[in-house]
Amino acid sequence: YGMSVITAIVAENTYRVSGIMDVSPDMIDKQIRDVYEDIYPDAVKIGMLNTIETMTAVAESLKIWQPQNVVIDPVMYAKNGSPLMSLDAIETLIKVVVPLATLVTPNIPEAEEIAGMMISNIGDMKVAAMNIHEMGCQAVLIKGGHAKGDATDVFYDGHKFYQLTTSRIQTKN
């Protein structure tokens, strides 16, 4: 079963983000606890964590419940480029959240922010994946949808790289 924990409510469309309302850390904790007490998940996928307080609440819950598989998709920007994560939270993401991940799945702009480097080609994606892996996660998948040409994702597990390439599908969303 798919179960959700809401960390923020975002009002947005394809042109802009008009508002973000954070859910309190206490409410995040209650949601996570209620999920785990009912149906223990086989995997956890984490998306938008936009504040230090939200990241801390989620990280503490992960330490308590110790899920086997944790996928972190560090949602930092909306499709239109609007920021969804406060700049002061990026360090907390790197030091507190990323080390708890089985897999981190940033897109290119997010990988640039986390790895602290520009990405302009597949080689750069590999270097960024290694840099992010060194932050403590088990594996990294950099999503190449923001690059030009075919969409190529780069997966790195600490030992080997895999490239996954397909034709780009143009969408507004």
Give, region by region, the residue ranges found by the protein language model:
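Structural motif
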Residues: 1-4, 42-43, 68-70, 83, ...
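Short glycine/threonine-rich catalytic loop with a Thr-x-Gly-x-Asp
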Residues: 168-173
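Short glycine-enriched, charge-decorated loop/helix-capping segments at active-site entrances
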Residues: 16-22, 82-87, 116-120
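Nucleotide and nucleotide-moiety/phosphate-recognizing core
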Residues: 56-64, 152-161
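Conserved phosphate/ATP/ADP-binding segment of small-molecule kinases
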Residues: 87-160
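Conserved N-terminal subdomain of the carbohydrate kinase-like
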Residues: 1-79
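Residue-level detector of conserved, well-ordered beta-strand and adjacent loop positions
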Residues: 165
